[in-house]
């Protein structure tokens, strides 16, 4: 990382820098190491922001206004005035989106705050002003791929256009949130640093904070120590903090999951000085998706040791809303929200669950998420697996639990074994097992009306 005292000037190159040594298009991208070790700089306060209604919505059939408002309500219930889910963002281009944003603003919630997203266009800024929204994201692509290939402009022309838009926002009392798209392919020292330095000067003069959202548009960021810019998440955040002197409160990371690194990259951004991580519920977003909001809640819990007064069971309720009302199919093995995320199938694991569910469950998923541990029965379950299914499905406790050596478990196992001898390939359904239990151990059903699912 270069020294902070250096005066970085815009490098208005004639020929774009596409970093072809790192990004040869016909090959897999490369990681270049410089072995520079940067210090961690976890902010005192870290937050989650949401793009479910923006990046999330643009990657699937549009939500209805009713769905947008209901999801917004769920996010508020989940946050529970903890302030962890700090903001969400809306498109303003259609009447439907503007109406939904208006209804959400009328709710009067402190968290999440309603913000917007616009292109680098003053006409778009008028929409923000007319809506009375206090902060807006602004698309400010910063790599030469975008500047030269998409915008067909020079770096100076691009920078001047962006600064003019930010200035216009400040003049209207609107907080700019500058979305530095494709920062993991950008010339950090030749464009990003001089541009952000100018933004910070404007911020001080106006006495209005300007936020910097570092956007890993193609998921090319890597979290490792000693990686060279532009792919280094550590280097980007450290540079914004220490070279550009952007306050942690004004740095946000927005990632994509193209290389499976979106959660780790996001946590790394927190650890090295970004206060906020931009997410979408279930990770729904362009191509491989954004960082899942629910994932960062559990990252927050592990890093900070608590989630304040958040209502984490609302994560389950919101996932069920997406499946039942929006008809979005959540992959069954998705952590924390998939139907099978805490389902055990292996017989040897089921035996452990039978002894103590702590052995094979990540935490008390029933208490925290309203999702009790579940054992699925298959040809590999054995007596332990079947007994564990009975105990977990019917939520039996202490002396009410059924032992794997119970003769009635043998009766169920005989039926299960016969199913697979006959060529069955699917797991045994809960409804099938319920029928068997009602026949061989009806008193179990009488003990409780609760069922795991």
Swiss-Prot record:
Say what the protein does.
Answer: Catalyzes the condensation of the acetyl group of acetyl-CoA with oxaloacetate to form citrate.
Q: What GO MF annotations does this protein's record show?
A: citrate (Re)-synthase activity
Identify the domain of life. Answer: Bacteria
Task: Supply the PANTHER family for this chain.
Answer: HOMOCITRATE SYNTHASE, ISOPROPYLMALATE_HOMOCITRATE_CITRAMALATE SYNTHASE FAMILY PROTEIN
Reaction catalyzed: oxaloacetate + acetyl-CoA + H2O = citrate + CoA + H(+)
Q: What is its EC number?
A: 2.3.3.3
Record-linked CDD domains = DRE_TIM_Re_CS
Coiled coil region boundaries: none
SUPFAM superfamilies in UniProt? Aldolase
**Keyword Magnesium recorded:** yes
Sorted alphabetically, which InterPro entries does this protein's record hold? Aldolase_TIM, PYR_CT
Q: How is its activity regulated?
A: Inhibited by p-chloromercuribenzoate (pCMB), EDTA, Zn(2+) ions, and under aerobic conditions.
**Family per similarity comment:** Belongs to the alpha-IPM synthase/homocitrate synthase family.
Which Pfam families does this chain map to?
HMGL-like
Q: Determine if Magnesium is one of this entry's keywords.
A: yes
Q: Which residues are in the Pyruvate carboxyltransferase domain?
A: 46-316
Annotated cofactor note:
Can also use magnesium with lower efficiency.
Q: What is this protein called?
A: Citrate (Re)-synthase
- Which cofactors, if any, are listed as required? Mn(2+); Co(2+); Mg(2+)
Keywords associated with the record = Cobalt, Magnesium, Manganese, Transferase
């Amino acid at each position: 990382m270069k020294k902070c005292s250096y005066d970085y000037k815009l490098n208005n190159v004639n020929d774009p820098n596409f970093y072809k040594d790192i990004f040869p298009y016909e090959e897999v991208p490369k990681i270049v190491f410089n072995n520079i070790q940067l210090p961690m700089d976890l902010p005192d306060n870290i937050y989650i922001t949401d793009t479910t209604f923006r990046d999330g919505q643009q990657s699937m059939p549009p939500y209805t206004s009713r769905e947008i408002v209901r999801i917004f309500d769920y996010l508020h219930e989940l946050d529970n005035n903890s302030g962890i889910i700090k903001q969400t963002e809306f498109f303003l281009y259609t009447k439907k989106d503007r109406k939904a944003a208006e209804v959400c603003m009328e709710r009067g919630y402190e968290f999440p705050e309603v913000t917007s997203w616009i292109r680098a266009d003053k006409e778009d800024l008028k929409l923000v002003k007319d809506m009375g929204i206090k902060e807006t994201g602004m698309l400010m692509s910063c790599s030469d791929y975008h500047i030269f290939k998409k915008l067909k402009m020079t770096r100076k022309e691009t920078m001047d256009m962006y600064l003019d838009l930010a200035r216009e926002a400040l003049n209207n009392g609107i907080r700019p949130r500058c979305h530095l798209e494709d920062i993991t392919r950008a010339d950090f020292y030749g464009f990003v640093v001089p541009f952000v330095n100018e933004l910070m000067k404007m911020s001080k003069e106006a006495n209005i904070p300007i936020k910097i959202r570092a956007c890993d548009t193609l998921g090319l960021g890597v979290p490792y120590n000693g990686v060279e810019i532009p792919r280094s998440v550590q280097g980007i955040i450290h540079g914004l903090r220490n070279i550009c002197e952007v306050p942690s409160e004004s740095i946000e990371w927005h990632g994509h999951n193209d290389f499976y690194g979106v959660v780790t990259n996001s946590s790394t951004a927190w650890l090295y000085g970004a206060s906020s991580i931009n997410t979408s519920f279930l990770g729904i977003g362009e191509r491989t998706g954004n960082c899942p909001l629910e994932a960062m809640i559990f990252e927050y819990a592990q890093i900070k040791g608590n989630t304040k007064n958040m209502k984490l069971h609302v994560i389950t309720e919101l996932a069920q809303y997406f499946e039942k009302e929006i008809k979005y199919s959540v992959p069954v093995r998705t952590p924390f929200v998939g139907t099978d995320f805490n389902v055990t199938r292996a017989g040897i694991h089921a035996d452990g669950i039978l002894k103590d569910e702590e052995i094979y469950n990540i935490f008390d998923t029933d208490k925290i998420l309203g999702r009790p541990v579940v054992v699925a029965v298959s040809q590999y379950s054995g007596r332990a697996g079947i007994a564990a299914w009975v105990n977990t499905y019917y939520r039996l406790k202490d002396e009410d639990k059924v032992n794997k050596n119970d003769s009635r478990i043998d009766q169920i196992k005989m039926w299960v074994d016969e199913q697979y001898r006959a060529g069955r390939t699917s797991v045994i359904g809960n409804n099938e097992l319920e029928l068997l239990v009602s026949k061989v151990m009806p008193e179990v059903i009488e003990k409780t009306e609760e069922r795991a699912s």
